[in-house]
Amino acid sequence: MKRLLLIGCFCLMGWISLANHILIPMDNTQSNHLKAYGVVYHTLKKGLEVQWLLNYRGGSFILPFDADGRTECLLKGVGFEVIPPARLNAILAEIASPEVNADAVKLEKAPKIAVYSPKEKKPWDDAVTLALTYAEIPYDVVYDSEILDGCLKEYDWLHLHHEDFTGQMGKFYRNYRHMDWYKAEETTNKQTARKYGFSKISELKKAVVRTIRDYVSAGHPSRVYVCDVFGYRYFRYCFGCDGGRYL
């Protein structure tokens, strides 16, 4: 009799797991937003679908109930709720209402991410790589040589930030032109320019921007994020249009 009860309990737990979902809120109730993104990423890596609820509780996520996912949330301090089918249907119905500015977007693939940044920088020197490292989301650092060698076709997502694409090296010239790190960066850029047949750093940077433009124009399913005001303006000028999104 005890054996039958035990088997029945396991079957019931399995049925509940299949029926329920995990809601990861991204509003002020969330205790660790960056780690939450990491949980979502690793859920996608396992081949599971995720629903991104735009404008619902800060852009929350719905994950299939998965024991490993639940454990990951607990270990990483990510706030979550286990919700039954009725609650999920109510949330989706609320989002679908024409009176509500919200939507549910299905996520099916964990993107392969590249961050445009000098190789000599450490993850903690850069806000983007620091955030991705903390969230435990894998990424590759790429720079001018990799882009000109055609690496972009390997990635779904390219992040650009704090880059002066004019190649004038004037962003820190006044205060830092005598610093060793500034001189080393200038020397490296000049060497890279010569490697690809350019006489000036500005020509190198223009070629990099145009390579990114061609990559996006070819219809690759990627997103390009730009986070530097001046760099964005020059990037847009070379694109001839708003090819990226300015954050």
Question: Which stretches of residues belong to each language-model region?
Answer:
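A glycine-rich, often tryptophan-bearing local segment used as a flexible ligand/cofactor-contacting loop or short
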Residues: 170-247
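Structural motif
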Residues: 23-25, 157-162, 223
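Short amphipathic alpha-helices in soluble, non-transmembrane regions
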Residues: 69-82
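Boundary at the C-terminal end of the N-terminal hydrophobic targeting segment
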Residues: 16-21
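Sec-dependent N-terminal signal peptides
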Residues: 4-15
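Anion (oxyanion) recognition and catalysis
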Residues: 44-45, 74, 133, 216-217
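Aromatic-Pro/Gly-enriched surface loop or interdomain linker
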Residues: 30, 35-39, 45-49, 56-65, ...
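Stable alpha-helical elements in mature extracytoplasmic
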Residues: 36, 69, 124, 128, ...
